[in-house]
Amino acid sequence: MQYQVDTHTHTVASTHAYSTIHDYLAVAKQKGIRLFATTDHGPAMADAPHFWHFVNLRVLPRMVDGVGILRGIEANIKNIDGEIDFFGDYLKQLDIVLAGFHEPVYPPSDKATHTEAMINTIKSGKVDIITHPGNPAYPIDIDAVARAAAEYGVALEINNSSFEVSRKGSEANCTAIAKAAKEFGTILVMGSDSHVAFSLGGFERALAIIDAAGYPKSQLLNRSPSVLLGFLAQRGHHTVADLQALFDEAV
């Protein structure tokens, strides 16, 4: 199956990434990607874009040559209370909010602390997807996190980049996350975590993990634009309504 949705990408606005929105649109057309989210790192990261970058994402067109663009952020989990580095009404202007642990913002501690911080982030209602929860630098109680994510309707990401260029040793944790998600009915999503446009829609390693765990691919958020947009609308992102209408017209 061709997965046409990618929820996790970075542009040159995060200066350790190397592609523009235009680059992503070109690759999306080549690969048959119909919808992707631009989710640069939240402003607490040293090389992240300024706060205004995210406020001004509204200037991006909704769709270019049949490819939809979601205006988003990969925020940073800042502390054990699950606070993130984007807030208030500005969050409501975004289509999608991802959040995860990043060493420069919230250094690794211990399993209990990581678990509490992640669950508090899930409970906050501000975050739609937890990114790379299988990072071995941040061990968590996987069952507890999967149960909380299922209860609060938050998706857990199986991050393809974690098996290729970063977060080495994530395979066992991600397999356990996929198995727990199957058991507790947690929503999963595959994210390329692309830092260069050529990686857009690259899910091969993530899909292998999901297959090995026996997680039903029929429940993946990536399976169609309408599924992801419906998920985001249900979570209160009314900003996606116009994008939903454009995809409905294209059917």
Curated annotation (Swiss-Prot):
Its EC number is 3.1.3.-. Its cofactor is Zn(2+). Zn(2+) 1 binds at residues 8, 10, 74, 193. Binds 3 Zn(2+) ions per subunit. Keywords: Hydrolase, Metal-binding, Zinc. Zn(2+) 2 binds at residues 16, 41, 195. One of its GO terms (biological process) is bacterial-type flagellum-dependent swarming motility. GO terms for cellular component: cytosol. It comes from the Bacteria. InterPro entries: Phosphatase_YcdX_put, PHP_dom, PHP_phosphatase, Pol/His_phosphatase_N, Pol/histidinol_Pase-like. Zn(2+) 3 binds at residues 74, 102, 132. GO terms for molecular function: phosphatase activity; zinc ion binding. Belongs to the PHP family. This is Probable phosphatase Sputw3181_2734. It comes from Shewanella sp. (strain W3-18-1). The lineage of its organism: Bacteria, Pseudomonadati, Pseudomonadota, Gammaproteobacteria, Alteromonadales.
